[in-house]
Amino acid sequence: MTVHPSLQNYADAWTHSIEAIAELVQPLVEGEWNRATPCPGWSVRDIVSHVIGMETEMLGDPRPIHSLPRDLYHVRSDFARYMEVQVDVRRHHTAPEMTSELEYILIRRARQLRNESRSPEHVIRAPLGAEQTLEQGYRLRAFDTWVHEQDLRVTLGTPGNLDSPGALVVRDLLLEALPKVVAKDAGAPASSAVVVDVTGPVEFLRTVRVDAEGRGSVDGAPSLGPAVTLATDWETYVRLACGRVRPAEVADRVKVEGDQDLAEAILDHFAVTPN
């Protein structure tokens, strides 16, 4: 593989997760593909369709021309409509069609990775006609694929890979979103701090500090007098941050100390993945 060193971790994480997805869905019988997942509105088939569709876009394939039905309750934004096209166009595909297409995409993307010579700053297409760097694209595919692997594992009752390479990509990306959640969305007061303490397969303690101008930043140093401390396990953190559960559903798995109103506001805005 000739991929640039700064892309290697993302390529490895993506490979690990998409191969796990292929292994998870290979033995499924037809009815199991229709099972609902924690991803709002999507079945097992829908998640695999989404993964396939996003990989075809990384390959530069043209998007399908397809009109969405009007009764999809979970489609509430332009971004969601964009994502739904690759899903809805495959809603009536059979199990063998799904596994065959996934296998073919894996082969094509693996070949692309082997021959990858573009720089991390190379600009590629992004959803909704936007642009992103190749590094951003690789990072987001590693993130997305691991999160959907976990959706499938929850649905199929096959837990695992909570500490795989993809998990670390997800951790870093979610942590980057914390300052906005705390300082802007939840409105934490100026010159305050919020501590997030996560245990389990992926462990970390981070402090979000809000400066005198109300801007947030995150670091690994503990705070002596935080306004709020949130403690939870890694799986719950991911499910909250990715909008798979509401705070009330996992209240027994999140320990809150300090300002209860601020903690509630933070948890209400904790989901950062687009919908």
Q: Each predicted region: which residue ranges?
A:
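Short, helix-capping/interhelical loops that line the mouth of catalytic, cofactor-
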Residues: 1-9, 58-115
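Structural signal for well-ordered, non-membrane alpha-helices
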Residues: 18, 22, 26, 55-59, ...
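An N-terminal domain-cap segment
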Residues: 2-45, 58-60
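Short, contiguous alpha-helical
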Residues: 34-76, 127-183
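C-terminal interaction segments
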Residues: 222-275
